[in-house]
Amino acid sequence: MLDGRPDSPPITIALAKGALLPEAIQCLQQVGIDFSRFLDPGNRLLRIESPTRLNGQRYEALLVRTHDVPVYVEYGQAQLGIVGYDVLRERYAGTEARVAHLLDLQFGHCRMSVALPQDSPYHSAAQLPAHARVASKFVGCAREYFDRLDLPVELISLYGSVELAPLTGMADAIVDLVATGRTLRENGLIERDCLFESTARLIAHPISYRVNQQPIRELITQIRERWLGSLLVGG
């Protein structure tokens, strides 16, 4: 209870397990919200509340699989989420997004690209023959891209290392996330075309954003000033 008033319920943020988590937690720590317990190797909790508040507002976090972040936000179980733009593009490929995009957080830089074998006779996606086989974990993004090229291809959905598909002859090309390109090179592939750049984004449930507009706007302001401002100074 603050100033004799009952506490408002916490605002829930869905955070993605994996590569984005440390910087997502660091970003929120910069504005006074602490979910660092998720980084404790002994932690088994998937839902925690920050021991600190931002302007009196309580915050809690859900730790979920990367592709589940927009789902939790879309269905209102989390008011906010931090997730890669690539995940949003894949989730809403060919449809209207059902979450609000609030802020580019400027970390988790990578790109969605087409890669071909080094010995391929083709030097771009547009040169691939009709009905070429393309492997990807992001078939929605891949389909949108090849539709724009007006090139019919057979899309193969994979969940593991898509670099294996051309090596085994299963696919002529892949569409995948690329950061440094090292994994591609080590597996005899060359990045040929970039579909789009991706960074971590702050998203919101549209109705929850309107209901919690003041605290969420305060959060956005603090992230801009303390997190994005520090990146500009450091950069």
Curated annotation (Swiss-Prot):
One GO term of the biological process aspect: L-histidine biosynthetic process
Gene3D superfamilies noted in UniProt: Periplasmic binding protein-like II
UniProt pathway: Amino-acid biosynthesis; L-histidine biosynthesis; L-histidine from 5-phospho-alpha-D-ribose 1-diphosphate: step 1/9
Entry GO MF terms: ATP binding; ATP phosphoribosyltransferase activity
EC numbers, comma separated: 2.4.2.17
Record-annotated membrane-spanning stretches: none
Catalyses which reaction(s): 1-(5-phospho-beta-D-ribosyl)-ATP + diphosphate = 5-phospho-alpha-D-ribose 1-diphosphate + ATP
CDD domains referenced in this protein's UniProt entry, alphabetically: PBP2_HisGs (cd13595)
Annotated GO CC locations: cytoplasm
Keywords assigned by UniProt, alphabetized: Amino-acid biosynthesis, ATP-binding, Cytoplasm, Glycosyltransferase, Histidine biosynthesis, Nucleotide-binding, Transferase
Function in brief: Catalyzes the condensation of ATP and 5-phosphoribose 1-diphosphate to form N'-(5'-phosphoribosyl)-ATP (PR-ATP). Has a crucial role in the pathway because the rate of histidine biosynthesis seems to be controlled primarily by regulation of HisG enzymatic activity.
Family the entry assigns: Belongs to the ATP phosphoribosyltransferase family. Short subfamily.
PANTHER family: ATP PHOSPHORIBOSYLTRANSFERASE (PTHR21403:SF8), ATP PHOSPHORIBOSYLTRANSFERASE ATP-PRTASE (PTHR21403)
UniProt domain comment: Lacks the C-terminal regulatory region which is replaced by HisZ.
Subunit structure of this chain's protein: Heteromultimer composed of HisG and HisZ subunits.
Protein name as catalogued: ATP phosphoribosyltransferase
The species this protein was found in: Synechococcus sp. (strain JA-2-3B'a(2-13)) (Cyanobacteria bacterium Yellowstone B-Prime)
Protein's gene: hisG
